[in-house]
Every structure is written in structure tokens, then in C-alpha cells.
Amino acid sequence: MSLPRNVIPMPRSRFLRVKCIDCGNEQIVFSHPATRVRCLVCGATLVEPTGGKGIVKAKILEVLE
């Protein structure tokens, strides 16, 4: 009997590099936030929590691993 390849499962959450639609500021955010994530420059909402995966209201530039 062989062992399964994924003995330890990888998390489904990621960090995202997003760009604010209002001011163009680039910021790194978590994909599953517990609180509302706001832009550090203008204060616009970038990600809203939903109890799981957040609703991203900014442009996703890159998924970081």
C-alpha cells in the first residue's frame, strides 16, 4: 500500500497583491480576512469579510505563494 502524496494538505488561503481602484495604491492583503481591509492611502474598502473567502473590490495584480 502506498502513501498518498498529500499527507499534509495545503491551505486554500493566499496573500494577494491588489491595486486600489480609486487612488492606484498597491497593497498586499489576505484572501480570507476577518475584518474589512481598507486602502492605506485613501481609505477605500479593498476586501470585505464574508465568514470565508473575502469579496475583493480592488484589481488583483498577483497571487503570492
From Swiss-Prot:
Domain of life: Archaea
UniProt cofactor(s): Zn(2+)
Listed InterPro entries: Ribosomal_eS27, Ribosomal_eS27_Zn-bd_dom_sf, Ribosomal_zn-bd
GO BP annotation list: translation
UniProt-annotated binding residues for Zn(2+): 20, 23, 39, 42
UniProt GO MF annotations: structural constituent of ribosome; zinc ion binding
Pfam families: Ribosomal_S27e (PF01667)
Keyword tags: Metal-binding, Ribonucleoprotein, Ribosomal protein, Zinc, Zinc-finger
A GO cellular-component term linked to this record: ribosome
Zinc finger intervals, C4-type: 20-42
Cofactor note: Binds 1 zinc ion per subunit.
PROSITE patterns: RIBOSOMAL_S27E (PS01168)
Cystine bridges: none
Subunit structure: Part of the 30S ribosomal subunit.
Family as reported in the entry's similarity comment: Belongs to the eukaryotic ribosomal protein eS27 family.
The protein's name in its UniProt record: Small ribosomal subunit protein eS27
Organism: Pyrococcus horikoshii (strain ATCC 700860 / DSM 12428 / JCM 9974 / NBRC 100139 / OT-3)
